[in-house]
């Protein structure tokens, strides 16, 4: 089902995200920071992204604006996250900001169906990251959620045609 063409878009985005969370086989990816430390993040959704032939997927104004806002919010907190100094309250605030932007992206999406299908993977990882940053999984850290969001942002930059976006 297309997020962009459904009046229940936000609810469906959350349901799709929860389906990804419940998937029994989550791929384990290594996330390497420029500072040298590593941590594991579950990143099954964006691992499924593919290019549109040899080119990136189309974007619309709502998607570009929302992803820019998510990127800016994440980058503002990234130094504290990277240093291990992000507080639970800061993680909660960042998660709320990302969730608001994702809801807006989904509600206002006008992508062609194939691009929309690939966007589902980015949205799923963003929302799983939001859940983890809120402390939604006692076996995972809030930092794991931030790493998942970071991976989703990098994947968006790699697979979607957004000339202004720098991941």
Which stretches of residues belong to each language-model region?
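Bacterial N-terminal signal peptides
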Residues: 13-24
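Immediate post-signal-peptide N-terminus of mature secreted/exported proteins
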Residues: 29-86, 165
């Amino acid at each position: 089902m297309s997020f962009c063409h459904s009046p229940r878009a936000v609810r469906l985005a959350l349901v799709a995200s929860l389906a990804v969370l419940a998937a029994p086989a989550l791929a384990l990816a290594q996330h390497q920071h420029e500072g040298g430390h590593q941590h594991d993040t579950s990143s099954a959704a964006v691992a499924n992204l593919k290019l549109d032939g040899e080119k990136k997927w189309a974007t619309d104004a709502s998607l570009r604006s929302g992803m820019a806002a998510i990127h800016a919010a994440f980058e503002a907190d990234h130094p504290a996250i990277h240093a291990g100094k992000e507080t639970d309250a800061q993680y909660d605030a960042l998660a709320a900001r990302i969730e608001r932007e994702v809801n807006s992206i989904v509600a206002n999406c006008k992508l062609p169906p194939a691009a929309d299908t690939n966007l589902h993977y980015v949205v799923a990882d963003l929302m799983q990251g939001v859940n983890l940053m809120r402390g939604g999984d006692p076996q995972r850290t809030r930092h794991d959620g931030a790493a998942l969001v970071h991976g989703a942002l990098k994947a968006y930059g790699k697979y979607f045609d957004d000339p202004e976006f720098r991941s």
